[in-house]
């Protein structure tokens, strides 16, 4: 459960992420593909090289989805319903991959905003990403 302080930290963080969400999403995907090569199996049709247009486009989707989620903290299931259906029924992504991408997103945000990435902000963003992951995997059952 996100506390009011968590929600404030998330809103502040996304205010600073702002127009960089697509770039950060792509960077996090690249980190994930490099650090956890098994995740590449879900993207056999992608050019996974650095700066790839396909990775950038998917990074934008990730960034847009997280921004939407941050704007709907009190109703993540509704905000992410279509995405949850897609990942559960069509793409069939192993739920562990959401944790891997979440880790890479945290590293990316910390790298770009080291002064703002306090332990409290880290904890709030981690809880937020865990909640997003839970919603995205809720329709697997």
From Swiss-Prot:
Residues that bear N6-acetyllysine: 16
Gene name of the record: HBA
PANTHER family named in the record: HEMOGLOBIN FAMILY MEMBER, HEMOGLOBIN SUBUNIT ALPHA
Species annotation: Vicugna pacos
Sites of Phosphoserine modification: 3, 49, 102, 124, 138
Modified residues (N6-succinyllysine): 7, 11, 16, 40
Annotated binding of O2, by residue: 58
Known role: Involved in oxygen transport from the lung to the various peripheral tissues.
Binding site for heme b: 87
One GO CC term, this protein: haptoglobin-hemoglobin complex
Phosphothreonine PTM sites in chain numbering: 108, 134, 137
GO molecular function, one term: organic acid binding
Family annotation (InterPro entries): Globin, Globin-like_sf, Globin/Proto, Hemoglobin_a-typ, Hemoglobin_oxygen_transport, Hemoglobin_pi
PROSITE patterns named in the record: GLOBIN
Stretches assigned to the Globin domain: 1-141
Family the entry assigns: Belongs to the globin family.
Protein name, entry field: Hemoglobin subunit alpha
């Amino acid at each position: 459960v996100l506390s009011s302080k968590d929600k404030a930290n998330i809103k502040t963080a996304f205010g600073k992420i702002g127009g960089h969400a697509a770039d950060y999403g792509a960077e996090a995907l690249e980190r994930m593909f490099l650090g956890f090569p098994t995740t590449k199996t879900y993207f056999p049709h992608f050019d996974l090289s650095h700066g790839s247009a396909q990775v950038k486009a998917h990074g934008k989707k990730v960034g847009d989805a997280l921004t939407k989620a941050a704007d709907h903290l009190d109703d993540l299931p509704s905000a992410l319903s279509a995405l949850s259906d897609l990942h559960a029924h069509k793409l069939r992504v192993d739920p562990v991959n959401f944790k891997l991408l979440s880790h890479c997103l945290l590293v990316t945000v910390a790298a770009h905003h080291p002064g703002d990435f306090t332990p409290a902000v880290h904890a709030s963003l981690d809880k937020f990403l865990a909640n997003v992951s839970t919603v995205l995997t809720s329709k697997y059952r």
